[in-house]
């Protein structure tokens, strides 16, 4: 459970520095993880982004102060990171469905979010099916887009990219280069790391290839890794989302493995059929 304890250490760090302008890279460091992998894991375990958790917790504590102290509303707004009373009031109403003034007068029920403690329930009734494989470095060819992790932009925009490439013929072009070991279309997520743009990822739609060039497409080298390949079966995107959650909430905490921090992949069959028995895979590099 060491992996889970690292996540909790990062959460405790956020709580201890809740009134500060937190650097997500520093938070992730508490979990021994990159910014991307920490934020991804946090969202899968809690169904809430890191920024949303911080916002909820700060507004919860602000509501408590409004109810229990005589501090001025403007001072409380500044204390919890809002530059103007108007911005504070707007955010406060969105969460608590009342204004700060109404909260001070005890009107209505506030939406209070408690400090988070990660607990994992090991269900096991429907275990994830997986296989461990060793694979040397290989090349993929495809197109990439850059996405921010802030406010879940990547979660909203990546499905739009898939719709785009499925409708404009890009997938058909890519499949002509698919002559490597992995048969199918890949969704490859590359953490840019702290030395590049903080809070950004490169997302590739690609195929494995042995060819050096691909015309309009770019190439990316995937490092040699030990991979855990998880089976995903069922209609998209529900089956994929459910499996990701199971991996991080049930499999990783007891597996003895850690994420290697290199690119991870989803593998989809070329025909793209959307049926109840649709088969796809999740490839995660581990150490």
Predicted regions located by residue number:
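Absolute protein N-terminus
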Residues: 1-3, 128
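Short alpha-helical elements of helix-turn-helix
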Residues: 4-8, 56-60
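DNA-binding recognition helix and immediately preceding turn/loop
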Residues: 5-49, 68-83
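A solvent-exposed interaction/effector surface
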Residues: 40-44, 48, 60, 64-67, ...
């Amino acid at each position: 459970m060491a992996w889970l304890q690292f996540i909790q250490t990062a959460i405790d760090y956020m709580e201890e520095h809740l009134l500060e302008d937190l650097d997500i890279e520093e938070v992730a460091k508490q979990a021994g993880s990159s910014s991307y992998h920490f934020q991804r894991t946090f969202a899968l375990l809690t169904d809430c982004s890191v920024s949303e958790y911080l916002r909820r917790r700060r507004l919860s504590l602000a509501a408590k102060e409004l109810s229990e102290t005589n501090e001025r509303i403007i001072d409380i707004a500044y204390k919890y990171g809002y530059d103007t009373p108007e911005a504070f009031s707007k955010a406060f109403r969105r969460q608590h469905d009342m204004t700060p003034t109404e909260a001070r007068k005890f009107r209505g029920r506030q939406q209070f979010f408690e400090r988070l403690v990660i607990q994992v329930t090991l269900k096991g009734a429907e275990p994830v099916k997986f296989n461990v494989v060793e694979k040397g470095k290989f090349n993929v060819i495809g197109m990439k887009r850059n996405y921010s992790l802030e406010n879940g932009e990547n979660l909203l925009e990546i499905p739009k990219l898939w719709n785009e490439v499925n409708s404009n013929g890009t997938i058909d072009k890519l499949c002509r280069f698919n002559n490597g070991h992995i048969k199918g279309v890949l969704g490859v997520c590359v953490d840019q790391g702290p030395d590049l743009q903080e809070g950004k990822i490169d997302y590739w739609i690609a195929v494995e290839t042995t060819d050096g060039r691909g015309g309009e497409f770019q190439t990316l080298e995937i490092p040699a890794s030990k991979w855990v390949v998880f089976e995903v079966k069922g209609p998209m995107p529900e089956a994929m989302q459910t499996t990701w959650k199971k991996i991080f909430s049930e499999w990783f905490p007891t597996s003895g493995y850690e994420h290697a921090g290199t690119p991870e992949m989803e593998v989809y069959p070329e025909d793209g059929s959307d049926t109840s028995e649709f088969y796809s895979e999740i490839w995660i590099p581990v150490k």
